[in-house]
Amino acid sequence: MGENDPPAAEAPFSFRSLFGLDDLKISPVAPDGDAVAAQILSLLPLKFFPIIVIGIIALILALAIGLGIHFDCSGKYRCHSSFKCIELTARCDGVSDCKNAEDEYRCVRVSGQRAALQVFTAAAWRTMCSDDWKSHYAKIACAQLGFPSYVSSDHLRVDALEEQFQGDFVSINHLLSDDKVTALHHSVYMREGCTSGHVVTLKCSACGTRTGYSPRIVGGNMSSLTQWPWQVSLQFQGYHLCGGSIITPLWIVTAAHCVYDLYHPKSWTVQVGLVSLMDSPVPSHLVEKIIYHSKYKPKRLGNDIALMKLSEPLTFDETIQPICLPNSEENFPDGKLCWTSGWGATEDGGDASPVLNHAAVPLISNKICNHRDVYGGIISPSMLCAGYLKGGVDSCQGDSGGPLVCQERRLWKLVGATSFGIGCAEVNKPGVYTRITSFLDWIHEQLERDLKT
């Protein structure tokens, strides 16, 4: 076929063509039953018809059974890049079993309210004892989370941990020389308990602090310059399109729907350390690459998360600071008062705000948010709702991708990224956010992969 030839179109499958019925020439005058039977018999002997039908049913059943076995990964790990299932013991074992070696990433995490260090080994997450722990191991752990440096590691009594982190333990193998410890999950042995009675806590980033006052936004208030120092404006071809949150000097978290089909990095710039979008003296930062979640589909709402990597690292000051990511399995209770911010419209259908606004919004349980009078069952576990069922305060158009933050132990944490809603500040239609704890593995994998390149 030449370059100018039209592409060949495949004929659509139909059961009529399978049985040869499309070849029948039906007269506009209804024929008698014997005539139709004669025509069918001339094309397909009736004695073969039951055999073919049974064969098709058997094929469908075989496929269904095969797919059922194929998709059933109970007690196993499913490779995200394919439908392959591997044993849990094969994850983080030093051998790549999945495409792109995904089973050898996300082998370290920081968990719970107290940031306990855990590694995945021998088919389970296990908490790191402080026995034989050395401070330089913390840098290795943070690198496995995608951070190029670390702030501190400390010791915490085992009984101060949440119960789910007190069952399985590991310690660094003290027989290994320091130069042999290159990945924590390859350098540990299992323990029933910690001899020291303490576990390791880890902090990889100096984040979640600010010097501004803590008291879109429909029903919101204008923000001060240092109040939300992690807030950024994502600008497409020079115009504010979405918000985002700084998590490291190089990385911004935003929503996938902001960048889907607009993922050419050179079309984007990022502005930081500003309140007003008008006559702003702050420089624009170029974007090196954009990654959105591979399972994001525009019409399905879920997996609405993306990362932007800047071409050059940010320099932090009182107006530019990273927000902390939450810890794995860290819970934020329903009703907790959190904050959303952005340059979105201050009324439904209005223009984007020229100044950064913020508003306090309580977290709403998914059970309430899925009520038939609210969102009617479309809110998945990887989403969360925040706002007021009575309306009046909400994120709005232009706030997409921006932060929903909560304060825990004097640190501000990124709990959600603004995703969608119906209208702005309407009754029974609170804002819907991407739940960041559901995507920590994905975020850390992208950061770790990039750090290794």
Swiss-Prot record:
Write out the entry's keywords from A to Z: Disulfide bond, Endoplasmic reticulum, Glycoprotein, Hydrolase, Membrane, Protease, Serine protease, Signal-anchor, Transmembrane, Transmembrane helix, Zymogen
How would you summarize where this protein is expressed among tissues? Strongly expressed in liver, cochlea, brain, cerebellum, spleen, lung, and muscle and at a lower degree in retina, kidney, and heart. Expressed in the spiral ganglion, the cells supporting the organ of Corti and the stria vascularis. Isoform 2 is strongly expressed only in the cochlea with very faint expression in the cerebellum, spleen and muscle.
Carbohydrate-modified residues: N221
Biological process terms in GO annotation:
intracellular sodium ion homeostasis; proteolysis; sensory perception of sound
Please give the SUPFAM superfamilies that the UniProt record associates with this protein.
LDL receptor-like module, SRCR-like, Trypsin-like serine proteases
The membrane-spanning stretches of this chain are: 49-69
Write down any Gene Ontology CC term: endoplasmic reticulum
Domain called Peptidase S1: residue spans: 217-448
Q: What is this protein called?
A: Transmembrane protease serine 3
Source organism (scientific name): Mus musculus (Mouse)
